[in-house]
């Protein structure tokens, strides 16, 4: 409905341009907001106040001109001017009930699909040769939620798991395997079962032995030169590491597959060409033997030029080089309209620089939108990045296991008579959902405190609260299984029915905001408010004990649409629902 109001205002603007009341070349930014106080209508805009200067009239005069220019529309009951020049729209009640009935019969809940775009989404992207840790959680689940929402809207989404599968760490691992095989023969292969321990042991050797470090660097050169033995081992490391990653993805309910992996190594053959192309355009400079690009808009605090390093003095390449190659591929081969990067906010400057350079060098099409969807850190209760008690990195699998264990204790305390098998199934869903929702419900740009106690609470904006809210709504239909709703329709007569109906009608609008800004917390907040609106409705409006059959069926339809919206919303967040808790 919000987009419908915007469309009506756009038509009014065109009429005012034709009447020469406002300049034909004026680009009006139309903002429509939902009102908090329904006595002021359902939607409001400050458009008249924005046009005052160009129309050379006072805001209320402009507001009246806009209203007079609005096309007749059956979905709008009336339009009023308020205060200094706000325009308030009152939606026709029949239009709202028609919208709700349409959503009820539609798999997409009445979400009008926009013009489909090709959207490349770079997310998760862990460094291989180590197990995933808590630092990988945010990119993985925020990116996946946005991917699901984009696909729900009808866009073509190309997932890109830009894993760190190349670099000096592999020389270190190759050297350690070589050393172990000299000592243990083929038994050395067993050590790879615990890749994290293998990596730590290799790092100790690298730090303590200059001879080992020299050999590691030599093996990197051999790997990059295509040495068959080195490449075979490298593929083994990657395969084992990716297997660990996909076990985590499966537990998290994340949609990434092996087919979505396109790591740094995929761009190895393009890196020299990136250097040549930048050089041919006169963009490269030399600084201490390295090849760099200086851009006027990027400077240090002292006003010194801040370079993008393209190639080190020893000939090695950096993240910027492979990122530029990846951007060119995503623009010119994948033909992306948008490229979204779900990467830590601490990389903001890096992305500002490479996005700017990619455009300067014409590596990407002008119409491609490059967007860094940065996020804050997940911190412990001391406000510092989340660590183990000994100060080590927390493995993601360990975090998920602890969440499931704590959820099992919680569910068992609520259902002491439930059999262990069902308890375990419910605990798995609740545990994983709690970890994901606790993260997704926070503004992605903010740091947040990780707390098992808060995330497993049945009160507040948490996964257990929403999962329980869904089972409560779904439970109504178990008691009303024999009621035939064929031919029934929604009627909004009680204030709480209207509040619930208005909240249900906002689903498409919230989804649009989540997709445009890459902010799953908008959807989380909406689902929490929807659950609250249903709770208020259920307390004030008897459903199965309604005064009439028509009223009972209308309220059952509202409950049905609420259940459908909660289930779909949680699914878009990658959260499984339960029929019983």
From Swiss-Prot:
SMART domains, alphabetized: Arg_tRNA_synt_N, DALR_1
Predominant location: cytoplasm
Superkingdom as given in the UniProt entry: Bacteria
Annotated motif 'HIGH' region, positions: 126-136
Cysteines engaged in disulfide bonds, as pairs: none
Molecular function GO terms recorded: arginine-tRNA ligase activity; ATP binding
Subcellular location as annotated: Cytoplasm
Gene Ontology cellular-component terms listed: cytoplasm
Any GO BP: arginyl-tRNA aminoacylation
InterPro entries: aa-tRNA-synth_I_CS, Arg-tRNA-ligase, Arg-tRNA-synth_N, Arg-tRNA-synth_N_sf, ArgRS_core, DALR_anticod-bd, Rossmann-like_a/b/a_fold, tRNAsynth_Ia_anticodon-bd
E.C. code: 6.1.1.19
SUPFAM superfamilies, per database record: Anticodon-binding domain of a subclass of class I aminoacyl-tRNA synthetases, Arginyl-tRNA synthetase (ArgRS), N-terminal 'additional' domain, Nucleotidylyl transferase
Family annotation (PANTHER family): ARGININE--TRNA LIGASE, CYTOPLASMIC, ARGINYL-TRNA SYNTHETASE
Binding partners and assembly: Monomer.
Family: Belongs to the class-I aminoacyl-tRNA synthetase family.
Protein name from the UniProt record: Arginine--tRNA ligase
Lineage: Bacteria, Pseudomonadati, Pseudomonadota, Gammaproteobacteria, Alteromonadales
């Amino acid at each position: 409905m919000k987009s419908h109001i915007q469309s009506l205002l756009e038509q009014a603007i065109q009429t005012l341009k034709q009447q020469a009341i406002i300049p034909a070349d004026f680009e009006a930014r139309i903002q429509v907001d939902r009102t908090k106080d329904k006595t002021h209508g359902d939607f409001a805009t400050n458009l008249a106040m924005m046009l005052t200067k160009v129309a050379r009239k006072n805001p209320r005069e402009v507001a009246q001109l806009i209203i007079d220019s609005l096309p007749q529309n059956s979905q709008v009951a009336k339009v009023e001017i308020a205060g200094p020049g706000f325009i308030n729209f009152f939606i026709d009640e029949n239009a709202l009930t028609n919208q709700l009935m349409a959503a009820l019969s539609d798999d997409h809940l009445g979400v009008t699909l926009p013009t489909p775009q090709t959207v490349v989404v770079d997310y998760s992207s862990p460094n291989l040769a180590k197990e995933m840790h808590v630092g990988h959680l945010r990119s993985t689940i925020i990116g996946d939620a946005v991917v699901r929402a984009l696909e729900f809207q009808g866009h073509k989404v190309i997932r890109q798991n830009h894993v760190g599968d190349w670099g000096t760490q592999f020389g270190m691992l190759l050297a350690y395997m070589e050393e172990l095989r000299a000592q243990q023969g083929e038994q050395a292969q067993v050590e790879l079962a615990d890749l994290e321990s293998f990596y730590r042991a290799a790092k100790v050797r690298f730090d303590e032995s200059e001879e080992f470090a020299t050999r590691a660097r030599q093996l990197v050169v051999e790997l990059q030169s295509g040495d068959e033995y080195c490449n075979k081992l490298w593929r083994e490391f990657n395969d084992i590491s990716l297997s660990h990653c996909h076990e985590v993805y499966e537990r998290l309910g994340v949609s990434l597959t092996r087919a979505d992996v396109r790591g740094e190594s995929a761009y190895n053959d393009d890196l020299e060409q990136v250097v040549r192309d930048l050089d041919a355009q006169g963009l490269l400079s030399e600084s201490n033997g390295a090849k760099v690009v200086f851009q006027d808009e990027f400077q240090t605090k002292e006003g010194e030029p801040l370079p993008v390093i393209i190639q080190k003095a020893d000939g090695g390449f950096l993240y910027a080089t492979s990122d530029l190659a990846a951007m060119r591929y995503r623009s010119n081969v994948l033909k992306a309209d948008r490229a979204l990067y779900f990467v830590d906010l601490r990389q903001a400057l890096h992305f500002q620089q490479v996005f700017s350079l990619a455009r300067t060098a014409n590596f990407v099409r002008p119409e491609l939108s490059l967007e860094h969807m940065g996020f804050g850190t997940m911190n412990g209760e001391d406000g510092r990045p989340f660590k183990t008690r000994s100060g080590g990195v927390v493995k993601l699998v360990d975090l998920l296991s602890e969440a499931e264990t704590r959820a099992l204790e919680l569910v068992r305390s609520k259902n002491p008579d439930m059999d262990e098998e069902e308890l375990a199934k419910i605990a798995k869903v609740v545990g994983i959902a709690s970890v994901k929702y606790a993260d997704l419900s926070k503004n992605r740009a903010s740091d947040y405190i990780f707390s098992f106690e808060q995330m497993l609470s049945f009160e507040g904006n948490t996964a257990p609260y929403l999962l329980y809210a869904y089972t409560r709504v779904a439970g109504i239909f178990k008691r009303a299984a024999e009621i035939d709703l064929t031919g029934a329709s929604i009627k909004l007569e009680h204030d709480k029915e209207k509040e619930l109906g208005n909240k249900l009608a906002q689903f498409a609008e919230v989804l649009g905001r989540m997709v445009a800004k890459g902010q799953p917390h908008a959807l989380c907040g909406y689902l929490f408010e929807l659950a609250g609106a249903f709770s208020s409705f259920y307390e004030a409006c008897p459903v199965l004990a309604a005064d009439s059959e028509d009223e009972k069926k209308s309220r059952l339809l509202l409950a049905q649409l609420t259940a459908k919206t909660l289930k779909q919303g949680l699914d878009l967040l990658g959260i499984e629902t339960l029929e019983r808790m």
